[in-house]
Amino acid sequence: MFSNSYLVYISETNLIHMTNEILAKSPSQGGILLTDHTKMVLNLGYSLAKNYPSYNDETLKELMVALILHDIGKCSKHYQDYMKKDVELDSEDLESPIKFNGPYHNSISWAFAIVCLNGVRPSIFKPYKHFPLLSSVLYHHTVKDDETLRAGDIITSIGEGDITVMKEFYMEMCKYVKDIFGIDILSSHDYTLVDEPSEIGYPLSDEKLFIDKKNCKTPGEYFNFTAISFIDRSILNYADRVVSSREYDNERILVNDVDYISSIHNDRLTRIPFKEDFSKYTDKKRLDIQIDTINKCFDNKEINTNVICASAGFGKTLMGLITYMKYQKKTLWVLPTLSLCESTYKSVIDELETLNASDQVSVGLFYSNEFKKGDVNSDIIIIGIDALLGRLSKNNLTPLLLDALNANVIFDEFHEFLMNEPLFAGFINLLKTRKDYTLANTFLLSATPLDFKNLWGNSHIKYWEDMPIYGGDIEVEIHYKEETTLDDMSFSFPENSITILPTVDAAQYAYINTPIETKLIHARYLPEDKKNHLDTVFNIYGKKSTVKYKTPIIGTNIIGTGFNISTRTINDYIITPMRTIQTIGRGSRFGEYSRVIYNVISSNMKADTGIRKLIESCACMSMRTQWVELLKDYDGKVITKNELYTIYNDFMKKYTKEWNMYISDCFKNSTDNLTKIRYVSGNYKKSDDDKLNRGYTYRGESTNFYATVPLDDGTYMDPIVCDINIRFKDDTDPKDRYYFMLSGLFNFPSKNELKYRWKIKKNYEATFDNCLGLARSKDCPLLLSNFNYKKDIGLYRRDL
C-alpha cells in the first residue's frame, strides 16, 4: 500500500492524508479508519477513567498515551496490505489472528513506544516507570510473536516509511487529546518523539504480564504499579472491544457524546431494585442482624471493603442478596472452587425463591471459560476465582474484566485463596486495587477470615467480628483417634454422617471397602456424573431435604467448606485450625440437632504423603501440630460451638506472630510465582476451546491432561481431566514414563496414533513431554490401562 522509500520524502500535507486512509478493520469488519477507531477508544477510555479517583495528571496522561498507541502498529505496510485483501475474520471471535508476514500489531505498538518515545524505555534504575503503558499496549491482545524479538529489531523490520507514518499518526492523536480533553501529552519529555529510532535490545520476553516484586523499592510501589496496570489494561481492552464490536452507536461515540458514552458502562452496573419479601424467614433476630449489618456497611461511605466474619449457618448467602438489594448494583460472587460455584448458584436460586424474587433477578454461572447459566449481562454472576483472575490476563469477555474492578464483588470463603501459588497474589492485588484505587464495594465472607493488616494496614477496610455464632448452644462431642494407614480406619459410617478424607484414592478405598451403603463424592468424575453426585448430596443433606434415612457420605475436602449441608456426625481426617471451624459448620447447620459428633482422626503424615501435601498447601505446619495436640485434650469431652469458637480465637491470638509470618511467606512466594504466568498463544481455533492450559496457571504448573480407560463393556470412557501425579510420583524413573506413553497410545480417533508415533523419540523425557502436550487436547486422551471407571466410584485404580 505504501512505498517505504517514497514515504520518507512525502510532504507533511500528504502524510496526514495517508494517515486518514489507514484502516483499523477490513471492509468486511466495518472498514473503520484507524484515526476514527482510536478517537473512539480515547473518548470511551477518558470517560471510564473519570470513575477512578486514583488517576492524577501524570497517570491519566500515561493512560491516554496507551490508548493512542494500542493499534499504532496497524500503520505498518504488511498489515494494511492484509486489510486490502478484505479477508473476513471469524465474527464470533475478535481475537482471530491476522495471518501475514511480519510482527503482529500489538508487538509493533509496544516496540514503537520503547524505541520512538524519549523516556518510555525501561531501565535498570526505573524498570517499571512506564510498566502500565507498555503492559497494556502489548497485552491488549495475546502475544503471538517470537518472544526473543527485540524492540529495536521489530521497528527495523517494518521499515522507515512505516515509522514515519506512525509518528505522524501519534502526533495527530496527541493533538486530538489536547483539543478535546485539555491534556498536553507532549509537555512531558518522556512522551515526545525521538529524532532517530535507536537499536534497543529489549526483548518481548522481558515485558512481563505481572510486575516482579523484587524490582520494586517498597510494597507500596509494587501495589501502585500493579493497580494502575490493572486499571489501564481493563480500560484499554474494554474500550477497544466496545468499539470493535459495533454493538453500540459508534457515530455518537466518535463525536464524543458524553452522556451516551457514560451510559454504555454505567448501565452495565446499575440495577433496578426488586421488591423483597422476608415473610418466610422465621428467625427474625438473625434477619435483623443481617439487614442491620449491611445497612451499616452502606451508610459508611469512607469504607468500601467489608469483611463479614459470620459463622457457618448464619446466612451469608442471604446477606449477599441483601447487599445486592441495598446497593442496586451488578454483583460478582466469587468462589474458590467449581463445586462451590455450583453449590452457591443453587443456594442463591433457592434464596431468591424464598424472597419471591426469582423473576426479578437474573443469575449467571461462569467457570471453565464459559457461562453455564445466564450470560455476561446477568445481574449476579457466580464465578470461580481462577476465572475472575483470568480476566486480568486474557482478552476474551472483557466486560467481566471491567466488572472485576467496578461492579460490587463478594469474595465468599476467601480464606481458601491462601496458598503459595499465583492465585493468592492475584487475589490480594485485585482486592488492594479495588480497595484503594476504585469506588467499588467489596465484601469478604468467611467464618475464618484472613487478617490483611500485616499486608497493608487498616485503611478503607472494616472487620465485622461481633457477629453471633449461629447455633452457638449446640453441643459438640469430640473424639480423637490416631491412625497410621487407611486400614486402621476405626470410625464407622453411621446414618447421617459425612467422612472427609484427604485424597481421592483414600475416599475411594473407604467407599469400596465399607460393607454398608454409602455415597461417594470427589472431583474425579465425568462432569455429568459429578453433577449427579452433588445433587445426591444436596438432596440428602441440603436445607430442603425431606429424606428420613440419610445415607452416609464419604468424600474429600470438597464437602468440608462452603457446602450448604447439615449432618449429625463428622469424621474429619483433615485437621487444621481453620478447617476444623469450617467443617464443624456442617454439623447441625440448620439447627435440627442439639448435639453433633466430631471425630478427629490424626493420620501419620510420614506414612501418607497425600495428607502432608494437602496440609502444607493450606496451613502452617507448626500451628497444625499444636492444634492437633489441643484437640487431643478434648477427647471424650462435650463443649458447645460457642466454646469451640472461643478455643479457636484464643489459639489464633496465641499464634498471631506465626500466622502473620505464614501469610507473609505465602504472599512472597505467590508474588514470585505470579510473574511466571504468561499468555503467549498461537492461532486461535474453535477446536481449542477444550484444550487445557500449558505452562503456569494461577494454581501453579499445569500438569493436567485428558485421559481415558477401557470399560468393562469393551468401550472407552469419555475423556476426563486428570493430574499427571495420578500416574507418576515426582521421582518416577524417566524410562517408566516412556513405557507408560507407549502403552498409552490410543487410537481416538485414528489420526492421533500417527501423532503419537511421530512424537516418540529415544529421549524419554522429550517423549513424555510431547505426549503430555498432545493429551491436553480432548481428542487425544492418553489411555490409563491400570485404571477403571464406574459411575459410583469415578476414575479409580484397579489395584485399589
Predicted regions and their residues:
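C-terminal helicase lobe and adjacent C-terminal extensions/tails of nucleic-acid helicase motors
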Residues: 2, 494, 509, 521-531, ...
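N-terminal accessory nucleic-acid engagement/regulatory domains that precede
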Residues: 2-12, 123-272, 778
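Walker A/P-loop
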Residues: 301-323
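Conserved strand-helix element at the start of the C-terminal RecA-like helicase core
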Residues: 330-341, 493-514
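Inter-Walker segment of RecA-like/P-loop motor cores
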Residues: 354-393
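SF2 helicase catalytic motif II
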Residues: 387-388, 397-432
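Interdomain hinge/linker at the junction between the two RecA-like core domains of SF2 helicases
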Residues: 448-493
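Conserved helicase ATPase core of P-loop NTP-dependent helicases/translocases
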Residues: 526-556
